[in-house]
Regions:
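Short hydrophobic/aromatic helix or loop-helix immediately within or flanking a transmembrane segment
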Residues: 86-113, 117
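Juxtamembrane membrane-water interface segments that cap and precede transmembrane helices
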Residues: 93-105, 263-297
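Membrane-interface alpha helices of multi-pass inner-membrane proteins
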Residues: 151-155, 176, 188-203, 247-251, ...
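Membrane-interface transmembrane helices that cradle and orient dolichyl/undecaprenyl
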Residues: 172-188, 305-309
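Membrane-proximal, lumen/periplasm-facing interface regions of secretory-pathway glyco-
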Residues: 359-406, 417-419, 426, 435-437, ...
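Luminal/periplasmic acceptor-recognition loop/helix of membrane-associated glycosyltransferases
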Residues: 413, 430-475
Length: 507
């Protein structure tokens, strides 16, 4: 675990979370490693581990692995559909190609456990980064911990082996660089480099660019409006941050797909209507859910404390808060975004908590607790067998050997969330659909899929695509219908999966 460095050597001892004043150099180094702030960081890390120690069942990861395999083996980018029989050869751009590679190499080396470890490492780094941002904002390690503890609960919405995590890691890095610039520590030259990486790991770069634009714009005005204030950039600051903004936009085009990758987030937002309206994580936030209640509580606490304490807010802080809250309310997947953005603001309002005092720190007790938590995490590290058992509950794992041996002579209609798993593990079976919804929505396939599983016109869709086999969840309306429809028989069935075959000729 990395310690949080002191913002200024002249600060009073009570504000320096990692600066014990007594002892030799070796003793001071040891005390930093087992100090109370580090203990709090380990508690946060253990909480993340507890929430995230069960599974890797994200439907996208499987086709991400196949894409990375194509890149590594052929040294060329995937530029069209290679896996389906419904949209074969259709143009497609892999907007997460760079963030797929760590998962792929870990999977090659350690299998499903490698996927879990890469996922866990990214989430831990994000949460530690949020904890650091909260401390920089509040200068109070206890306030930072309380706010970050709440953030972990919101972040669970995106726990899984997802390329999105790399995007949130880039966001944390951006916020750190912007904070430094506002505080007079100019490392803004790193921002174009950051966006050059970000555009190749995930489409969430567009959020970072919006926040960057807000940050630049907030320094173009000067004034005070009640408790809202704006401080104008100096001419040197304005020139520097403006130049970095231009270079960051230009850096977005440093990708294998050039402008296609830059336009992808806008295509998703404005053209992929079925995708947005039918995929669960794109649904509006449910305030009956625990995460919804926590988000509301964090927002309410931030606002109420700000009113009671009469603190002034900078323009960019208010706008950042509005962007985060609106995004999370509109699309539940952005709860992680809200966790990252809201935590430093809440921590700032909690800075009335007693500050950390290294003179009364219990270093040996901290060390004992840290070792106990790390040992517990190591002891309960999920095995490959445990991860595999969890996969069996959600994917047609047991059916794969049967599909490979059967030598299917016809097209297969499959569950959307199983498509990626089939792409990786049943390569002799071209899929009907998978979770790359964008390519299937453009071709009209996703609309037909919804008609089939919604029992609007299931038999007509199966006939339209000349389907011989249906591989689907055991307990679903479609499987119930086919069980009671003449012309279909069951070839295979287990606790998760049913494989139907059409009796007679295919239309």
């Amino acid at each position: 675990m990395q310690s949080i460095s002191s913002p200024a050597a002249s600060a009073p001892p009570s504000s320096l979370p990692l600066q014990p004043s007594l002892g030799s150099g070796d003793s001071r180094g040891w005390r930093k490693l087992v100090s109370f702030p580090v203990l709090l960081a380990v508690i946060l890390g253990t909480l993340v581990y507890a929430f995230d120690s069960g599974g890797i069942a994200d439907p996208d990861i499987w086709w991400h692995l196949r894409n990375a395999e194509v890149l590594v083996q052929t040294h060329s980018m995937v530029r069209s559909d290679l896996y389906s029989f419904t949209v074969p050869g259709a143009p497609w751009f892999n907007e997460s190609w760079l963030s797929e590679l760590p998962y792929y190499f870990a999977w090659q080396w350690m299998g499903t456990l490698g996927l879990f470890l890469v996922m866990l490492l990214q989430i831990e780094l994000i949460i530690f980064g949020v904890y650091g941002l909260a401390y920089l904002s509040s200068k109070n390690v206890k306030a930072a911990f309380v706010a970050s503890w709440l953030a972990v609960w919101l972040a669970t919405v995106s726990f899984g082996p997802r390329t999105l995590l790399a995007g949130w890691l880039c966001l944390v890095a951006e916020l750190f660089l912007l904070w430094q610039f506002r505080e007079g520590k100019d490392r803004s030259w790193l921002l174009p480099l950051l966006f050059a990486v970000w555009v190749n790991v995930h489409g969430s770069w567009v959020i970072g660019m919006v926040l960057f634009a807000i940050f630049i714009g907030s320094g173009l005005i000067q004034g005070t409006w009640g408790r809202l204030e704006a401080v104008r950039w100096t001419p040197a600051q304005r020139s520097k941050i403006g130049l970095m903004g231009i270079l960051s936009v230009a850096a977005l085009f440093l990708n294998p797909y050039t402008y296609h990758l830059v336009f992808f987030p806008f295509d998703l937002g404005f053209r992929q209507k079925l995708n947005i309206s039918h995929i669960e994580e794109w649904q509006s936030l449910d305030f009956h859910d625990l995460r919804g209640k926590i988000l509301f509580g964090m927002l309410a606490a931030t606002i109420i404390l700000a009113l009671v304490r009469k603190r002034r807010w900078r323009v960019e802080e208010v706008l950042f808060l509005l962007v985060a809250f609106y995004s999370a309310m509109t699309y539940s997947r952005f709860l992680f975004l809200a966790a990252i953005m809201l935590t430093p603001l809440l921590a700032k309002e909690l800075d009335f908590l007693p500050p950390y005092n290294p003179r009364i720190d219990k270093y040996w007790l901290n060390a004992l607790l840290i070792v106990a938590m790390l040992a517990g995490c190591a002891r309960y590290l999920p095995t490959r067998e445990r991860l595999q058992r969890n996969l069996v509950k959600q994917y047609p794992v047991k059916a794969i050997p049967y599909l490979q041996q059967l030598n299917l002579k016809g097209r297969v209609f499959n569950h959307c969330l199983w498509g990626g798993y089939l792409i990786l593990n049943a390569r002799n079976v071209p899929v009907f659909i998978d979770s790359r919804i964008d390519i299937y929505e453009r071709g009209g396939v996703f609309a037909d899929y919804l008609d089939a599983i919604g029992i609007v016109k299931p038999l007509e869709v199966l006939d339209k695509y000349h389907i011989r086999y249906v591989l689907f969840e055991k307990n679903s309306p479609l499987t119930y219908l086919l069980r009671h429809t003449s012309g279909w028989k069951i070839n295979y069935e287990d606790g998760t999966t049913v494989l139907f075959e059409r009796v007679g000729s295919v239309p």
